[in-house]
């Protein structure tokens, strides 16, 4: 769900974030590049990370909160991702995902 418009730091200045599979798989890990759907050659969220993953798994990009939303944009007409606060065993949705209608809401064309 995420792309460089949601987490710009890796594309902008090669910042790194921890990456993990939420299913907590540890066997048969391989090296992966975690990329987003934006049609840019710099849309990497992580490069060469060793995790086990398969289609349908959820991958966490860790410690992204401090600069996530404030550096995020609607580049490529992409709504910004939701934000989830995780502490211990609890999680809470603290900002909902934007919708395409949210993007259009700010547009005006005068006659």
What are these regions (language model features)?
Residues 1-111:
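Charged (often Lys/Glu-rich) extended helix/loop segments that serve as interaction or gating elements
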């Amino acid at each position: 769900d995420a792309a460089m418009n949601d987490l710009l730091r890796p594309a902008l200045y090669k910042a790194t974030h921890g990456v993990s599979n939420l299913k907590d798989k540890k066997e048969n890990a391989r090296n992966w590049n975690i990329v987003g759907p934006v049609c840019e050659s710099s849309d990497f969220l992580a490069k060469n990370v060793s995790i086990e993953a398969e289609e349908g798994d959820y991958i966490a990009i860790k410690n992204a909160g401090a600069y996530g939303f404030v550096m995020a944009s609607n580049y490529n007409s992409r709504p910004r991702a939701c934000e989830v606060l995780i502490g211990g065993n609890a999680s809470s949705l603290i900002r909902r995902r934007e919708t395409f209608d949210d993007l259009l809401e700010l547009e005006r064309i005068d006659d």
